[in-house]
Amino acid sequence: MTRRFVHLLVFLLLLDVCTSARAQQAAQRRSPGFDVEEATIERIQQAILKKQITTQGVVEAYLRRIQAYNGTCVNEPQGILGPITPIARAGQINALSTLNLRPRARAAWGFDARKARSMTDMVDEARNMPDSLETAAAQDQQFAKTGRLVGPLHGVVLAIKDQYDTFDMRTTSGADADYANDRPPDDATFVRRLRDAGAIILAKANLAEYAVDGARSSFGGTFCNPYDTEREPGMSSAGSATAVAANLVTCAIGEETVVSIRWPAAVNSLVGLAPTQELVSRDGMMGAGLNMRVGPMCRTVQDAARVLDAFAGYDPKDEMTVFSVNRKPSQPYASFAVEKRLDGVRIGVLREYMSRKLFAQADEESIGLIERAVADLRKLGATIVDPGAAGELFTRCIARYAPELANSAFARQYPKLFPTDVSAQAGADQIATLLQLREDPSRVPPELTLRTLNAGGFGATGEGKYWINRYLSERGDANIKSNADLITRARFYQDPNFPDRKQAREQAERATALDTSVRLQGRFAVQTVLLQCMQEQRLDALVSPMSTIPPRKLTAPREPAVNGRTPIGWSLIGQQGFPVITVPAGFARSIWDRVAEGNGTRLVGPVSAALPVGVDFIARPFDEPMLFRIASAYEAATRHRRPPPDFGPLPARR
């Protein structure tokens, strides 16, 4: 259903819009035979078709849960911009920063003004911007006339990460900045496609400001892990993840540059898909870059596939999506997410990411859960290619191909092999050295593995400033026109336990050139090496941990990097454009926490816990069908997803 058609229906309904009293009565309705908690897309649509609930009733059911669970989850003695302290079992998560409700409906539901659709248009009466309840009412009216759903996502209630443009809701990437109009002029392409498929955009999700690190933004505040509100909920897309985990929405849309879809999904017992980068448009994304991609976060593999079906494909506004032309399957992605067996599928085990000898006590239990996942895949009929607990799947293959393909990065990584003079010019014949290594890969340093393949640096310069300025130029706001304006016309939180956002913007501003050549070379090198390694072993997919580190306490020190393992999980393969899906793999029951001690830190434990762990499945670019086959079979056999116990069903209202 197009936006224009929705607007027409909403206009016809305006005379009959609920008053505040009637809206409150609607909020108290509970439809027999349907519960929104853990409801899948199929379950929601079947309930609508069977007239167990209306689309408006679905939205209201989620709003009741938002009322109950979306409050502040930390102590803020100096206000939203000051230092925070965690609250044990807070019963709140602060996942959603903006609600798609007109002022009258927002007041009737008891939400404060900071959750308004716009802070620059507090009247908010434009008829071409129906709110979520009005859109739902329009769907109900259309369904009453035709008996058919308006589209494949009819009744599906979504949250969108605040990094993405929504024409009817404020978009600031978590910043408390002085936009003349905090609403962008149009939807991001993928948001428009979701609406056209019938999805109802209920909220903008809180995020780490400007989609960097940490569970905090200057406008939205701190958000928390629903499985332990004293802990971080993942990376920048964690507001999206926690909203889905606590059943505040059906699914949400995240963004991933490093692990920002997969890590929040893993620690919130969700399915998170970081698709092939060129498959989904990045149009309307604040701060897009070469490694950024759009993906769904849902409670089931099938739901993630249905959302991908709605927005995947070429978009002339994002030239990278040209690579997706003729690369989508002829049948829907959702049709692949129905497997029960994996006979004939060859899956390689990335033991490089699972070594008990190389990592720390903090990694132990998660490694055990991934080993159990490998055993489950074998039971499902998959052919498991496993180098063994002490082995590494790709190290020999990497030694053959990486030095030549990564050349300059490889030379920087091993200066003893490739000495330079004081002017950084080659001090010896590097070509001769590379040829020798090609002829005899045993001479390649043994520490060159999948863990260290990018240690020579695959970075870019100027991206942070370039992409923000490009986005703001296209947005055309009268006040905020550049990264420099974001520095001078915004307020920033100040807390030593979280990254300094103003400092990050100032650092980005110092760039005067855009250079992505090294990143592009690294991307080509990693893709070529891994595709060749997979082909040599006839692998359809790979399995690995998403992360082996439990989420830390919100104000605790980070676990230090060890042998290539970072405190936020394994990111190399996904960063280079391979599609990766994270699926719940169980719960860590006994963990180790990093705490400050004097001028350093130490591990304490074991600590009793019940924290979700995720397993990653990785496929070749554009082979999402293989991912959905493996993930759906594993999900069906294991059913590890559990909702957070402190965010259960609400009491029935009389």
Model-derived regions, located:
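Acyltransferase
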Residues: V59, A137, D187, P332, ...
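Short glycine/serine-rich loop/turn segments
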Residues: I87-A90, L99-M119, A126, P130, ...
